[in-house]
Amino acid sequence: LDISIEDASKLRQNYWDTYGATLKGLIKHHNIDPIDFLSTTHDLKNFNDLVMPEVNLKETISNIKGRKIIYTNAPKSYTDRILKISNIYEMFDEVFTIEDSDFTPKPNQASMANFLKKFNIKEGVFIDDIKENLKTAKNFGLSTIWITKEITHHSFIDRKIEKISDLLTF
């Protein structure tokens, strides 16, 4: 787009507020190719130096019972790379990325419905660091765990933890 940085920032925020992701607005209003956009905005150069997995991450994940499915607004290449660098790729049964949701991000209701249908999820625990995503999950009947240091409470949050390894205390 041929616009100023200031206008781009406003447009980005408007699309984020309206669609839940900048990309969705760019696709709808500017015919932006989502694959080109994602490859540009999720450039993986020097990526290994930026990923710092939490201590006890593998132990924590291995102690989670049932199917473990990643549901992310990130692209597949980016997600796979993070999981591999963190040495936890093989610990997950499935990965559902922004491409799988037709570029419709969480917390969108249709995206959540598509995710649940694809993996035939009727019940489960949804863990996220964004409360809006948890609200959608709760609306679909899932239990919710919010990763946060916030002290506020919301009726759609079942549990709060500060870091993933806190799951070991359950």
Which role does the model predict for each range below?
Residues I35, K58, S62, I69, ...:
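Asp-based, Mg2+/Mn2+-dependent phosphohydrolase catalytic module
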Residues L1-V55:
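N-terminal helical cap/lid subdomain that shapes the substrate entry/recognition surface
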Residues N48-M52, I70, F103:
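Short, surface-exposed alpha-helical recognition segments that flank or form part
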Residues S9-L11, L44-N48, G66, I98-E99, ...:
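Short, contiguous strand/loop micro-motifs
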